Amino acid sequence: MGDVEELKFSAEVGKVLSLVVHSLYTNKDIFLREVISNASDACDKLRYLFCSDQSLMEAGEELRIVISVDRDRRELTVRDNGIGMSRKELIDNLGTIASSGTQRFLEEFKGGKAQGCDLIGKFGVGFYSVFMVATDVVVESCKAGEKVGHRWQSSGDGVFSVSTIEGDVSRGTKVILTLREDEFDFLDKFRIEHIVTTYSDHVGYPIYLIASDGTEEKLNSGVAIWTKPKDEISESEHMEFFRSISHIGSNPWMVIHNKNEGTIEYINLLYVPSVKPFDLFHPDRRCSVKLYVNRVFITEDNVQVIPQYMRFLRGVIDSSDLPLNISRETLQNNMVIEKIKASVTRRVLTSLREKADSDPVSYKTFWENFGPVLKEGLCEAMDTESRESILSVCRFYSSNSKEGELISLGDYISRMKPGQEHIFYLSGNDLESAMRSPQIEGMVSNGIEVVLLVDPVDDFWTSVVLEYKGVPFKSVTRVDESDLEKFTEGDDQQSTKKKKEKKDTDDAQQKENVEAFIDYMKKVLGDSVSDIKVSRKLTTSLVCLAVPEHALDIRMERFLREQKQLSYKGSRILELNIKHPVLSGLLREYKDNGESELLENMVHVLFDQACIIEGEEVNSAVDFANRMNQVLARLFKK
């Protein structure tokens, strides 16, 4: 060794080194990722420069990265045969934080962006992550076209030395790390393999590990299939890659592969699974799309490159323009991530919409697996256009559904009756109970279709989404007489008028009795109801519950109470079908005999029945049973 020169790091480097070692990175594994990325950059540079200067390397020579360990000396070495660095470049690039050679190289060639020249070290701090695990760092390098090599050495204490390497040296760079005593496990073969396959599996150059017997073992696949043209990727390649990143044994239901070359460049290779992943409804709602920068894995945990309501997606997003902060773990420009996220979201929704139109049978399987997750997006803050894009791919059961048929909101609107102003819907626990609900009887009997919502998330989005394509949503629990009057089957204006006149006459004859009985019911039920009225939407059922126009939907209110987010019970309206034989009998009983214990019990039974139908708890199950028993005993006593 000769010509040793000791130098100090540039100003404030001591503080920055401390930041890098103690604060910037949360995962020590990334030091090896950073060193390998630098080696890959060096190979990229040489490959690019070789196009104009073929004396820099032998034609056909393999550019490679080699990892070796010396357990006795606690040394981990990473060597590449890339472009290498001169003495001045060692000082400039390794002696100054945030002044990386890669950034300088890009600036020199910014006049013509080279195809295939992928350089990720855009900030000069990645290298310094080695001091998290090493007490001493040596970098030996010989630049392509030169015959003299140089050695850079530092313990991360604010100074470094540079010297000339005596004797013959080969082109490239060798990084030698003397590991701390408590970081010995980074010399373990399996630990190295895990880090390489996790972060650098798709680096475009082979990464070898020299085994204990001196043989070389290739660690990375070196293939990033998302960088290939989509028509050159076989179905078997897709299946193999999907299974490797998703840990799902089945084949993907759909592949979404695009290369975006607009303002921000990125590639997305996304898969929709054909089965529901086990962690789909994990409380963390984790997304499983991996973020890469030029084929180097960055994260899948702390950056949301897809919205959470698309967390069923598996795959990768790889960007060459993605800005990085000083650390590759913390992305610098959230706005760029948001742009990628918005673009990917649009592409996914477009692909789903096309699939729903072209293959509705297959799409039903997708919807049954992931529809509830996708509808979570409707609850998020977004503009109307984005929300309607989600609604356009949503599918629903309806009162007209046959054998589980699903419809779109577009289908519903196209079938609306003349004069219909709302998309009517009903929330229920399941399809069967919703189809049999008294709430929709009047709508169905008048030919009005009702959307049936049976997922828990439906109660949330219907409270924030007010309309679709200009048509407002309305719960059938808020439907009143005016919503049904104009849809009576077979009515024209004249017959409607005549029927109304006859109805008024009939009502006048029994109005006093009906109003008196309703007043009596209000007295019996007290604060349990806010109102009792004659229903127009009931045709076969006896009673149902309704809510005022602007009140919470019954199912939503119940959920909030269960979650302790609501301490009160909202007002209920009890609706009566006075054409029902039971009500007719009660009206006669009240008219003939007035108030009685039997009538009082029956009034409570009617209200409890309405609560049970809506899934509400009765005030007292014991009282309900006792009243029913008294009514039955009275019946059989006769």
UniProtKB/Swiss-Prot annotation:
Keywords: ATP-binding, Chaperone, Cytoplasm, Nucleotide-binding, Stress response. It is found in: Cytoplasm. Gene3D superfamilies: 3.30.230.80, 3.40.50.11260, Heat shock protein 90, C-terminal domain (1.20.120.790), Histidine kinase-like ATPase, C-terminal domain (3.30.565.10). Its main location: cytoplasm. Residues 559-638 are annotated as: C. Pfam families: HATPase_c_3, HSP90. Residues 1-328 are annotated as: A. GO terms for cellular component: cytoplasm. Residues 329-558 are annotated as: B. NCBIfam families: PRK05218.1. Molecular chaperone. Has ATPase activity. This is Chaperone protein HtpG. It comes from Anaplasma marginale (strain St. Maries).
